[in-house]
Swiss-Prot record:
It comes from Rattus norvegicus. Pfam families: PAP2. This is Glucose-6-phosphatase 3. Keywords: Endoplasmic reticulum, Gluconeogenesis, Hydrolase, Membrane, Transmembrane, Transmembrane helix. The chain crosses the membrane at residues 26-46, 57-77, 116-135, 141-162, 168-186, 198-218, 255-273, 284-304, 308-328. Induction: Up-regulated upon fasting. It is found in: Endoplasmic reticulum membrane. The keyword Membrane applies. Its main location: endoplasmic reticulum. Signal peptide: none annotated.
Length: 346
């Protein structure tokens, strides 16, 4: 295993020093694949294009992120930015590598969440686009473009994570494989407009299930805060260690998203617009308004205390699907005052 990790450091060093002109590209790619962006950007963008597809992306995102958290607790996995120092590798072998603000994530490293969660959540989008393209062209070369773009993007995400010292190559590979498999398995099984109790129980299961596993492992003598301690110890700058990269930050986001989706689908606002077909201009207006509300939510910041942050994060992501699914479309439809035919199944 030591040789595998050493090879990962050498690969990161090569990416940083042999291809310096690509630094901004890698930073941009890893930003695009940030799991938080699946919730805040990809979800509304896809939802306003296709309600069914948007809900699929959202559901798969928070289920896969929860599974990624559980996998990391059991698989552990060092991250390169701390392993290179903690193992003594940097003292024995001169190495020219440096960290970035997005390097210092606090959770265990295996498997890569960026690769796993993004790969799974974008799977139904890729399949839908592939089906649309296949229905409009007979060219086999054109038909493979969506799948090729999907694979190319995930490959770039994996390389960016190695470049940033956030993951070793084998962790990236594990994340890619898990993401594709979960996307394939979960896409046909996304629940659509179930009763509110179903979503409430889902949120409760995510929260209590992860908490039970955490305390069970803690009782058995496993210190699951080990990765937080190492990240804080070896990160070049303390301000790069962000609270929203902690494992329980993703748990509060996932459980809040599950509950929020259920509430959104059972609000009076959604009941009024669920069979309304929005025009392209209205969809664009919905997305712009949703992004404006997101900017406001981000402007609010978060409490400095860890426990209060988790509560705030839960409430924030409970509110977010209510805004995207119910309130924003209702506001746009009401203000535009346009009659629309019943929505087609999408």
């Amino acid at each position: 295993m030591e040789s595998t990790l050493s090879a990962g450091i050498m690969m990161a060093e090569a990416l940083q020093n042999q291809l310096p002109g690509l630094e901004n590209m890698w930073l941009w790619v890893t930003f695009l694949a940030d799991p938080k962006n699946l919730f805040q950007f990809y979800f509304p963008a896809v939802y306003y294009a296709s309600r069914r597809l948007g809900i699929s992306l959202f559901w798969i995102a928070f289920i896969t992120e929860w599974l990624n958290l559980v996998f990391k607790w059991f698989l552990f996995g060092d991250r390169p930015f701390w392993w290179v120092h903690e193992s003594g590798y940097s003292a024995q072998t001169p190495v020219q590598i440096h960290q970035f603000p997005s390097s210092c994530e606090t959770g265990p490293g295996s498997p890569s969440g960026h690769c796993m969660i993004t790969g799974a959540a974008l799977w139904p989008v890729m399949i839908a686009i592939s089906s649309q393209v296949a229905s409009q062209t007979r060219s086999p070369w054109v038909r493979v473009i969506p799948g090729l773009a999907y694979c190319t993007f995930l490959l770039a995400v994996g390389l960016s994570r190695v470049f940033l010292l956030a993951h070793f190559p084998h962790q990236v590979l594990a994340g890619l494989l898990a993401g594709v498999i979960l996307g394939w398995l979960l896409s046909p099984r996304v629940p659509m407009e179930r009763e509110l109790s179903f979503y409430g129980l889902t949120a409760l299961t995510l929260m209590l299930g992860a908490s039970l596993m955490y305390w069970t492992l803690f009782t058995l003598g496993l210190d699951l805060s080990w990765s937080i301690n190492l990240a804080s110890k070896w990160c070049d700058r303390p301000e790069w260690v962000l609270v929203d990269s902690r494992p329980f930050a993703s748990l509060s986001r996932d459980s809040g998203s599950a509950l929020g989706l259920g509430i959104a689908l059972h609000t009076p606002c959604y009941a009024q617009i669920r069979r309304v077909h929005l025009g392209n201009g209205q969809k664009i207006a919905c997305f712009v308004l949703a992004m404006g509300l997101l900017v406001f939510l981000e402007w609010l910041g978060h409490p400095p205390q860890i426990s209060l942050f988790y509560i705030f994060n839960f409430l924030k992501f409970t509110l977010w699907p209510c805004l995207v699914v119910a309130l924003v479309p209702w506001m746009v439809h009401t203000l535009s005052a346009q009659e629309a035919p019943p929505i087609r199944s999408s």
